[in-house]
C-alpha cells in the first residue's frame, strides 16, 4: 500500500518546501495543497531552470502526478489563471494535471482592497501581510458570508450573493477606511468570465482522495507558510489566517487524519522570518547580513528581504509537538559554510533569570525573552552540492547530530543546494 505523507514548514515559512515536494513527487500519485493561498511562494530549480509557484501544487511539473487544490485553500481566480498560463507557456499541460475543490473560498478584488487599507491604517503596528486578500477571504469564510468556487456555477445566484457581500465591504472601505469602493459590475463580470473554465477542473476532492487511498496510491500533502505562522499555534497575531500545521490536512482536504503515515518537517539550518513579528534569534549584525546574502533570503511572493537568525531549537520543539513530526529535512546547510562558529538557541531566559525550553503562547511573551545559545565550531569546507554524509565536514555532522538530539527527532533528508540532485535522502518518507 502507498504511504500518505505530509510535507510542511516548521519555522516561519520559506524553509525550502517546494524543492523537497518536487523531489518526492516522483513517488506520489497525488500532491494536495490544503491551506493558504497565493501568498505562498514555492521555488523549484530543475537543471538550473527556476519556477516559482504560489497556488498550484509543486508536483505540477511531473507528468505522473495529479495536483489538487483542496477546500482549505483560498483561490484568487485571476492569480490562478496567471499561474496556469505561465505554466502552459512552458509546455506544462495544466488542465490534464490539476483538480480543484469547488468548496474553495474565492478571493475577490474587495478582499485585496480591504487587506491593503487595513495594513495602511495600522501604521507601524502592521502585521506584514502580502496584501493579497488572504485574511479577509478567510474572515468571510468563517463569518459564512464568503463566496466559493461552486457559487460561480449559478450566475444568477452568484450575482445576488456578490451584491450582498460587496455592499457590506464597500461600506467599510468608503466609510471607515476612506478609500474608493470596488466596482460591483467589473467584479461580477471578471468572476463569471472564468466560471466555465474553473468548473472543468472541479471535483469532489474528498471522494477522489479516499478512492486513491483505498487503491493504495501514494498521496502527498503540501503545506504552505510554516508552523510558527499557524493561526492557532503561531506567534499570534503575527500569523497567517489558516492552519499551516498537520491538523490542517484533514480540514483543508477532507482526508481522514488516521490515514496519514508520515509528517516531514522542513527546517532551515538557520532561521528566517519575513514581515513583522517576534524573532528571538534574529541577527541584526554582520553575520546576519552574511547569511541573508548567501542564502538569497528574499521572499518568493513579495520580494521582501527576510530577517535572518540562528536556529531556534525551542521553537522547533513546539513544531515537533504540534505536528507529530516523523522526521526532518534540513535545508540550506551550505549557507553556513565559512562561519567560524554556529549557534543553536536551546532556551529562553526571562528577566528574573529563569530559563524555559518552551515557547510563550502569545507574541507579547517573546518581548521578554533573551535566547540562550549553545555555540559549536563552524566549518570552512564546502557542503554545497554534497550528496552523502561522508562528504560533509565533521563539524557539520556534529551540528546535525546536535539538532537531532535537541529535537528528539531524526533528520531524514539533507538539502545542500537548490537543485533536485543536491540532496541526501537518508530515509525515504514513502518507504
UniProtKB/Swiss-Prot annotation:
Q: Which domain of life is it from?
A: Bacteria
Q: Which cofactor does it need?
A: Mg(2+)
> Which pathway?
Purine metabolism; AMP biosynthesis via de novo pathway; AMP from IMP: step 1/2
> Which GO terms fall under molecular function for this chain's record?
adenylosuccinate synthase activity; GTP binding; magnesium ion binding
Amino-acid positions noted as binding GTP in the UniProt annotation, renumbered to this chain: 13-19, 41-43, 306, 332-334, 415-417
- Tell me the residue numbers annotated for binding Mg(2+): 14, 41
Q: Which family does it belong to?
A: Belongs to the adenylosuccinate synthetase family.
Name the chain's protein.
Adenylosuccinate synthetase
* Species name: Shewanella denitrificans (strain OS217 / ATCC BAA-1090 / DSM 15013)
Amino acid at each position: 500500500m502507498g504511504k500518505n505523507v505530509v510535507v510542511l514548514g516548521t519555522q516561519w515559512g520559506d524553509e525550502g518546501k517546494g524543492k523537497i515536494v518536487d523531489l518526492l513527487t516522483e513517488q506520489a500519485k497525488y500532491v494536495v495543497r490544503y491551506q493558504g493561498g497565493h501568498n505562498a511562494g514555492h521555488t523549484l530549480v530543475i537543471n538550473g531552470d527556476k519556477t516559482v509557484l504560489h497556488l498550484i501544487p509543486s508536483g505540477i511539473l511531473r507528468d505522473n502526478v495529479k495536483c489538487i487544490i483542496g477546500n482549505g485553500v483560498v483561490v484568487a481566480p485571476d492569480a490562478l489563471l496567471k499561474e496556469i498560463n505561465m505554466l502552459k507557456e512552458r509546455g506544462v499541460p495544466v488542465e490534464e494535471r490539476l483538480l480543484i475543490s469547488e468548496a474553495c473560498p474565492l478571493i475577490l478584488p474587495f478582499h485585496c482592497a480591504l487587506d491593503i487599507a487595513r495594513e495602511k491604517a495600522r501604521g507601524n503596528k502592521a502585521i506584514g501581510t502580502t496584501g493579497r486578500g488572504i485574511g479577509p477571504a478567510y474572515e468571510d469564510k468563517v463569518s459564512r458570508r464568503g463566496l466559493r468556487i461552486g457559487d460561480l456555477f449559478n450566475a444568477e445566484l452568484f450575482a445576488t450573493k456578490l451584491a450582498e457581500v460587496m455592499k457590506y465591504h464597500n461600506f467599510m472601505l468608503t466609510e471607515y477606511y476612506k478609500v474608493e469602493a470596488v466596482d460591483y459590475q467589473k467584479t461580477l463580470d471578471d468572476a463569471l468570465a472564468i466560471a466555465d473554465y474553473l468548473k472543468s477542473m472541479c471535483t469532489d476532492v474528498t471522494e477522489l482522495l479516499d478512492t486513491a487511498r483505498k487503491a493504495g496510491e501514494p498521496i502527498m500533502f503540501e503545506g504552505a507558510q510554516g508552523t510558527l505562522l499557524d493561526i492557532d499555534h503561531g506567534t499570534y497575531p503575527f500569523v497567517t489566517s489558516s492552519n499551516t500545521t498537520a491538523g490542517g490536512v484533514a480540514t483543508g482536504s477532507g482526508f481522514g487524519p488516521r490515514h496519514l503515515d508520515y509528517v516531514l518537517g522542513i527546517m532551515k539550518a538557520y532561521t528566517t522570518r519575513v514581515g513583522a513579528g517576534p524573532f528571538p534569534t534574529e541577527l541584526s549584525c554582520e553575520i546576519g547580513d552574511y547569511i541573508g546574502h548567501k542564502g538569497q533570503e528574499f521572499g518568493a511572493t513579495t520580494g521582501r528581504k527576510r530577517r535572518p537568525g540562528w536556529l531556534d531549537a525551542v521553537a522547533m520543539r513546539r513544531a515537533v509537538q504540534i505536528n507529530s513530526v516523523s522526521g526532518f529535512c534540513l535545508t540550506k546547510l551550505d549557507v553556513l559554510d565559512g562561519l567560524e562558529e554556529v549557534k543553536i538557541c536551546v532556551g529562553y531566559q526571562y528577566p528574573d533569570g529563569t530559563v524555559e525550553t518552551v515557547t510563550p503562547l502569545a507574541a507579547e511573551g517573546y518581548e521578554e525573552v533573551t535566547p540562550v545559545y549553545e555555540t559549536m565550531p563552524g566549518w570552512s569546507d564546502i557542503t554545497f552540492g554534497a550528496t552523502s554524509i561522508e562528504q560533509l565536514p565533521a563539524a557539520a555532522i556534529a551540528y546535525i547530530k546536535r539538532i537531532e538530539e535537541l529535537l528528539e527527532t531524526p533528520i531524514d533528508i539533507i538539502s545542500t543546494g537548490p537543485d533536485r540532485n543536491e540532496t541526501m535522502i537518508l530515509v525515504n518518507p514513502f518507504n
